[in-house]
Amino acid sequence: MCIRDRRIIRDTIAARAYDPLGYAAIPELTIDSAVIARSAQTDDVAIITIGRSCGEGADRLHATEYLLSDVEHRLIAQVSRAFHAARKRVIVVLNVSGVVEVASWRSLADAVVLSWLPGQEAGDAVCRVLTGKVCPSGRLTMTFPLRYEDCSTYDNFPYDYHGPKAIGNYPKIPRTPAIKNVHYVDYVEGMYVGYRYFDTFNRPVAYPFGFGLSYTTFAYSDAVCRAQADGNFALSVKVTNTGTCAGKEVVQVYAPVRSLRHQLVAFGKTRTLQPGESETLSLTITQRDLACFDEAQNAWVLDAGDYTLEIGANARDARLKAHIQVSAPLVVERVNGVLR
């Protein structure tokens, strides 16, 4: 937006009612369509920032935290229409504290940058990525679902319940039997949480676990896995920058565990590789990484069998495979059943 279209929002902030727990949101500013049209003619690119805060003592709400508001949807649509008509690009920066819905609007943007909450140097950090001074190499630590209803925890978590507010110490929360699982949650999903659920049951997602783009490309080769004397496994894989700019790559290794399709068992990042340059990463996969908790034994148990390792760029982008053989089941770690 050009200089003459800047607006002071101090009055909007001052008008917000006092809220000791910080749950109240600042009303979203609406931008006149004429301003957007004028900016599309004078500016090189549009950058839209979608913000979400975080806090303590309350869960993020589905309607106001996960979903974008009507004002945010209209802003993205109007800016996209105006700038694309002028053959210019639109970038959406997600300055958020958790997963937000992206499936309904991401096609309107040419790029989506997930900055999380980067603090006072956010502007400088994001600018360096957008201008190409830094080649992005971050990866998602969670799955972005198409809908919240697709999550395995959807049926068991009171996602739209907002407890009572109080100044000072938390009050005794009244019993609310009409709302499911407010006071007690039965985690019936068990191991099937996040990507372990989505990938095991082949559920479509917006962005898979471990996903992340780069300005360059990488090739994987020469994967070798060997058993070590201590019972762990040493994996090496060669990564080559096949693109046109320098960058780093995150290699991720997944293995099947019990009934799970796979779970992350190792990962590593290369140094900055110049175009055409290669590096061989050495990763260790421990017995504990491959083990699953057995309630009957109160222990982490490594099952016998053949394990196929998937080596790739994210949970749904396997580039290479390697194999591990475990000849007999092994109790890796015992724990005490103190909660029984």
Identify what each model region corresponds to.
Residues A82-V90, A109:
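A short helix->loop->beta-strand "cap" motif at the edges of active sites that frequently abuts
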Residues I285-A313:
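Short, surface-exposed ligand- or partner-binding patches at beta-edge/loop junctions that are enriched
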Residues I8-A24, N95-K248, Y254-P256, D303-A304, ...:
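Secreted, periplasmic, or luminal enzymes acting at the cell surface/secretory milieu
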Residues I50-D70:
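Glycine/threonine-rich flexible loop motifs
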Residues I9-S33, G57-T64:
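Acidic/histidine-rich helix-loop elements
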Residues S259-E295:
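Intrinsically disordered, low-complexity Pro/Gly/Ser/Thr-rich segments with frequent PxxP/GP/PP motifs
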Residues M1-R6:
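Conserved small/polar residues in nucleotide/adenosyl-binding loops
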Residues D43:
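An anion/phosphate-binding loop that grips the pyrophosphate of nucleotide cofactors and donors
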